[in-house]
């Protein structure tokens, strides 16, 4: 389309299993950024440039990994589908439709996105829901008409406190869970402190801008994220039920929106994928895989709706989405080899 080229590549084999590999070729940067900061490799073996790790290096990892399997004569698969998404960063109906269609043609998916440090992979991701809560009341003069008005902001304030009750408790004081604070305490952050269910009232407003006027309208926009499908559904029902919880007579609450994208859950099939990758890393490289959970979304959330999914098997990257993003090229060969060996094993044995 006019935003990029969505490329779907297919390899036919002689086996029974089909895998969907997903990477992306777009970046968060505007056109012309590469001319300002062209690709370069420094003396320490780090590559630099816009999108160098998210997700350019990993796009190449897949190509070299598949080339190695082909050179080795590996054909124990039904089909390998490799989709490079041109609109992953911003999302689009085009990309989401392609991912959904291809997922239903495969037995499992591997999302080739940015890896976490020290053999880190992502085994769970939160799902995403969005809501708009609109309160309609009756406005009027605060001094003379309070008795015949209905304050929409007061009702919204109550509704927001009810929203807050749906969220999981925070692990402690915010200042104790920054990257620096965890590092100072000798704790490796792998997302383990992310609360299971989070509710964020990110936007709030009213047409009223006078404190002497009782507001007749108010609204807020809410983002909800959960690690589990069951919890996502539970919160969805609870939020929609807030329309019936009126504490200010004369007001009406309307809740619109709902679940947008489901979580990427860690199922028994996903655990098998993790076990295979962990064995490969240990046996071939003497490494230990670190499992991460993430509150952000990737195409892995969309494939997980249909098939077991493992995420973030790319090359190790630092400071993505910034002008100092870099890739540790020393991880390229080990990561590519581990990916290829794991892929071959999963295609031979299946994931269920």
Q: What is the role of each PLM region?
A:
Residues 20, 81-83, 254:
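A structural signal for isolated positions on well-ordered beta-strands in alpha/beta enzyme cores
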Residues 14, 26-28, 87-89, 138, ...:
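Short coil/turn motifs at secondary-structure junctions
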Residues 114-115, 123, 129-352:
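Metal-dependent amide/peptide-bond hydrolase catalytic core
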Residues 47-60, 89, 150-153, 326-333:
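Short, conserved micro-motifs enriched in small and acidic residues
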Residues 18-20, 47, 107-111, 130-132:
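Short glycine-aspartate micro-motif
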Residues 1-52, 68-76:
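Acidic/His- and Gly-rich active-site-bordering loop/insert found
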Residues 55-128, 179-192, 347, 351:
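Acidic/histidine-rich catalytic neighborhood of metal-dependent amide-processing enzymes
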Residues 23-25, 52, 85-87, 112-115, ...:
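Fold-independent oxyanion-binding glycine-rich loops
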């Amino acid at each position: 389309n006019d935003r990029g080229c969505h490329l779907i590549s297919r390899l036919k084999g002689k086996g029974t299993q089909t895998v969907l590999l997903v990477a992306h070729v777009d970046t968060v940067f505007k056109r012309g950024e590469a001319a300002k900061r062209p690709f370069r490799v420094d003396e320490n073996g780090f590559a630099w440039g816009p999108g160098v790790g998210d997700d350019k290096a990993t796009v190449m990892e897949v190509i070299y990994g598949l080339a190695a399997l082909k050179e080795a004569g590996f054909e124990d698969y039904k089909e390998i589908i490799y989709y490079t998404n041109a609109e992953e960063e911003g999302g689009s109906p085009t990309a989401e439709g392609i991912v959904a269609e291809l997922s239903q043609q495969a037995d499992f998916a591997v999302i080739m996105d940015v890896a976490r440090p020290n053999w880190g992979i992502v085994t769970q991701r939160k799902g995403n829901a969005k809501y708009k809560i609109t309160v309609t009341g009756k406005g009027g003069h605060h001094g003379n008409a309070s008795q015949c008005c209905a304050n929409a902001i007061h009702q919204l304030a109550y509704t927001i406190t009810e929203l807050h009750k749906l969220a999981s408790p925070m692990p402690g004081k915010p200042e104790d869970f920054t990257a620096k604070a965890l590092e100072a305490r000798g704790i490796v952050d792998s997302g383990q402190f992310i609360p299971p269910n989070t509710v964020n009232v990110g936007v709030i407003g009213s047409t009223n801008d006078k404190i002497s006027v009782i507001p007749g309208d108010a609204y807020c926009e809410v983002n909800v994220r959960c690690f589990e499908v069951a919890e996502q559904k539970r919160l969805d029902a609870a939020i929609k039920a807030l329309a019936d919880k009126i504490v200010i007579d004369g007001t009406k609450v309307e809740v619109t929106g709902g679940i947008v994208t489901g979580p990427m859950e860690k199922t028994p099939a996903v655990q098998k994928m993790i076990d295979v990758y962990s064995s490969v890393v240990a046996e071939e490289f003497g490494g230990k895989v670190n499992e991460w959970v993430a509150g952000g979304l990737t195409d892995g959330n969309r494939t997980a709706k249909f098939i077991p999914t493992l995420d973030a098997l790319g090359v190790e990257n630092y400071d993505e989405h910034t002008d100092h993003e870099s890739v540790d090229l020393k991880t390229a060969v080990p990561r590519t080899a581990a990916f290829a060996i794991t892929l071959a094993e999963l295609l031979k044995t299946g994931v269920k």
